[in-house]
């Protein structure tokens, strides 16, 4: 099912996506960018209270991973966001089309395993 992965480009030069931090000419491959958005949904109603200049890696590490401290953001707000994430995660069940098994859903698993602890990995995936 993943024997094609060694041929998959992990970056590209155009389109939408997140810039590669060490080389702004490149964009991170979109499947890597689009498979953990549901984590963001858990805090979207609160993030508007955070000044944009403080939304950085340390902020997301504090909220999603419980690591470090997010400077410039009220600790109680960070804790509230962390509690929201912990309440809604892990995803109990993700349903998608069978045509997405070999790409989107595979990256969905890969990225959750790479970023989050095992207690936040998806619990179930269904295809139709």
Language model: regions and residue ranges:
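Structured secondary-structure scaffolds
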Residues: 1-128
């Amino acid at each position: 099912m993943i024997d094609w992965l060694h041929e998959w480009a992990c970056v590209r030069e155009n389109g939408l996506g997140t810039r590669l931090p060490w080389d702004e000419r490149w964009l991170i491959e979109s499947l890597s960018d689009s498979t953990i958005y549901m984590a963001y949904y858990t805090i979207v109603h609160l993030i508007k209270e955070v000044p944009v200049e403080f939304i950085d890696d340390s902020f997301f590490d504090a909220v999603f991973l419980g690591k470090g401290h997010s400077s410039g953001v009220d600790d109680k707000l960070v804790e509230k966001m962390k509690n929201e994430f912990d309440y809604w995660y892990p995803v109990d069940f993700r349903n998608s089309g069978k045509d997405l098994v070999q790409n989107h859903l595979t990256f969905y698993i890969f990225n959750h395993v790479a970023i989050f602890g095992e207690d936040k990995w998806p619990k179930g995936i269904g295809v139709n």
